[in-house]
A protein has these predicted regions:
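Intrinsically disordered or highly flexible coil/loop and linker segments, enriched in small
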Residues: 27-30, 49-70, 102, 106-117, ...
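Sequence/fold signature of self-assembling virion shell proteins
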Residues: 4-23, 27-29, 34-38, 42, ...
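Alpha-helical scaffold segments that mediate packing/assembly in large oligomeric complexes
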Residues: 22, 33-35, 39-102
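Extended, solvent-exposed, turn-rich assembly/linker loops in the middle of proteins
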Residues: 71-145
Length: 239
């Protein structure tokens, strides 16, 4: 027999608005051939989606369990000079790869669902794996690693089983002795339900138009409602 478990998801709102003058719209159309409303709508929708993505990433950082807790000089920190036991840089980077493997194995041991298969890391960590000769770039990034400063970047596949993503804002996290360099290993199964965190949209992104009652100038806004919820069977710092 089996049972169906359920959990409550509270939908919250996220919205952005913008105002512009009719004179601006007229000049922009006459000089540059651009539609002011369309340009602002594109900016607002892109910003909202970017904020949602960052919220998901921050949530992952917050609830992720500490890795590198065994056979390291300092729990939670993998020191390339001490813990890797390598003689030169490439050997040290391969030691880092072994530690990532251990953390991926820990996910399989804890969840019994599967081994970790997603890595989100800082740019220097991805570069270290590249120098070790274990990161195969996608065709678009065959020449060099092009890190996008506006969002998480898919860097390539590690050993044919780990999808590696670079967080371009990683410099703002944990700027202590490790210089803000880190990685997070996660698991995502083949089924949509086989994950640890779910994005649950309630109301899709909607556009609203209005006119100011005093200025008679146009206003536009975008609003969406959604929730983030952990897998009821997942284990993290907040579970």
């Amino acid at each position: 027999a089996f049972s169906i478990e359920k959990v409550t998801v509270t939908a919250k709102s996220r919205a952005l608005k913008a105002e512009y003058s009719l004179e601006l719209a007229q000049d922009l159309k006459a000089i540059h051939g651009l539609n002011a409303e369309a340009e602002l709508a594109n900016i607002l929708s892109t910003e909202i989606l970017s904020e949602i993505n960052r919220e998901v990433i921050r949530t992952i950082y917050k609830v992720a369990e500490q890795g590198a807790v065994h056979n390291t000089a300092t729990q939670g920190i993998f020191d390339l000079d001490i813990d890797s036991n390598g003689r030169w840089s490439v050997e040290k980077f391969k030691g880092l790869l072994f530690q990532i493997e251990r953390d991926a194995n820990a996910i399989a041991t804890r969840t019994r669902r599967g081994k970790g298969n997603i890595i989100m890391c800082s740019a220097d960590v991805a570069s270290a794996l590249t120098m070790a000769g274990v990161l195969d770039y996608t065709p678009a990034l065959n020449a060099n690693l092009n890190v996008d400063d506006t969002g998480s970047t898919f860097a390539g596949t590690l050993q044919g089983k780990y999808r590696v993503y670079i967080d371009p804002y990683s410099g703002g996290h944990n700027p202590g002795s490790n210089g803000g360099q880190y990685y997070v290993v996660g698991y995502k199964g083949s089924s949509p339900y086989d994950a640890g965190l779910f994005y649950c949209p309630y109301v899709p992104l909607q556009m609203v138009r209005a006119v100011g009652e005093n200025s008679f100038q146009p206003k536009i806004g975008f609003k969406t409602r959604y929730g983030l919820v952990a897998n009821p069977f997942a284990e993290g710092l907040d579970q």
